[in-house]
Amino acid sequence: MTAKRKPTALLILDGWGYREGKDSNAIANANTPFWDQISSQNPHVLIHTSGMAVGLPEGQMGNSEVGHMNLGAGRIVYQNFTRITKDIEDGVFAQNPAISSAIDKAVSNGKAVHLLGLLSPGGVHSHEDHILAACKVARERGADKVFVHAFLDGRDTPPRSAQPSLERTDKLLKELGCGRVASIIGRYYAMDRDNRWDRVQAAYDLLTLGEAPYHAESAVQALTAAYERGEDDEFVKATLIKGSSDNDAVISDGDAVIFMNFRADRARELTRCFVEQDFDGFQRNKLPKLADFVMLTEYSANIHTACAYPATELTNSIGEYMATLHKTQLRIAETEKYAHVTFFFSGGKEALFEGEERILIPSPDVATYDLKPEMSAPEVTDKLVEAIKSGKFDLIVCNYANGDMVGHSGVYDAAMKAAECIDQCLKRIAEALNEVGGQCLITADHGNAEQMVDENGQPHTQHTTGPVPLIYIGPKNISLKEDGRLCDIAPSLLDLMELEKPREMTGESLIVQN
């Protein structure tokens, strides 16, 4: 009979951050006796989950995708935002093969370069600095017609905050002497992701036909008129900005188009309108024969067009490494975070590794999770305890969604109830691990529920930039190093399992043997 395995578990408490202050801190103020016990009696430190520590620009809050990628990879995974910003700073962006080639083709045709994208400092789907850098590159490579088609934000930025971005862009293009902001439209239309093709068509027809319900002399005038109509940035209707003629800046045969969003999900639909011959979302009245259409990053493996920043492959994540060592592993979460403990934790790979099993627990069917703050945590725990006691798994990775998903609701009392539910679940898990001689690390991918009200007294619904806890439960006599990062967790797990880390993992183990 095969000997039962003593599991090492990683428990990821999504959105469970640390903050000194107790005001509006749903975690600190909740009744969590087990958490209080392990926080004071077990090895316990704080680790970093935002900014450069996870491959994001300094000061940028972390998120679940980035967090799980770093947790599983065992190295800092530089995000597209950071890769592109770094290339611009280092002068490498100007030589990017896809971007420079597209611009050169348009210039040799005597045609225009069109830059599409979310013109915003939000940093979630795009950054206006990238768009401005592309304007400069186009001019340096000889383009004398550079048109920015500005999609307006208002979701990752305040609802009416687009004016400085439009002014900054028009000012630069005027200085370069090569173009203007040629159209504006809210992201509600240009960046749909739910196959609402009527919205996307409004953007496509604006770009390719110059069809728009509104025209204006300048981008700022267009925005002012939209505000007067009661439209916030996100919902600004298609507006064409006049030049030498109404249609001098529509996308035409021989032009180059560069889509400057780095996040894929809301860039796919509009991209498909331009590049798919068998597109069937709506009837295209014009399909320009472009010199090139460039995606800033790969929006989908199924979209076949030039890409400036292809995905970098992550090899030897902890999941892949476990498989090469013929170890067994389990990934478990409820629906809301299932992709995070599977696809993202595996370095962007969907397929199961050899020896890997997965358990998906459905998330509750409620409008918002403050209505059921425990979500499916008790059911996740039932399956997790069963897996621990089964003796089947060397490594178990589990996500609890409550701190993040209930935190996003902005409802303080519900977030406290979520924390109290997690506390009860952790006690059950610790008892099961103790019973079989197992061990675990408890941490989070980023904070959220530790701050439920912002400095203006409004509900605080987004992630935080503060640290998160790291706690060890198990039989080993160890301490934990301070100042760790998410990328140090995989090496720490391997250390606890008495396994060497692969050379690809540049994170450091935080385990100190006493």
Swiss-Prot record:
Residues that bind substrate: H125, R155, D156, R187, R193, R263, A264, D265, R266, K337
Cofactor note: Binds 2 manganese ions per subunit.
Pathway the protein contributes to: Carbohydrate degradation; glycolysis; pyruvate from D-glyceraldehyde 3-phosphate: step 3/5
Active site per database record: S64
Binding site for Mn(2+) 2: D14, S64, D445, H446
BP GO annotations: glucose catabolic process; glycolytic process
Cofactor requirement: Mn(2+)
Gene Ontology, cellular component aspect: cytosol
Binding site for Mn(2+) 1: D404, H408, H463
Family label: Belongs to the BPG-independent phosphoglycerate mutase family.
Free-text function comment from the UniProt entry: Catalyzes the interconversion of 2-phosphoglycerate and 3-phosphoglycerate.
Subunit structure as annotated in this protein's UniProt entry: Monomer.
The protein's name in its UniProt record: 2,3-bisphosphoglycerate-independent phosphoglycerate mutase
Organism (species): Hahella chejuensis (strain KCTC 2396)
UniProt gene name: gpmI
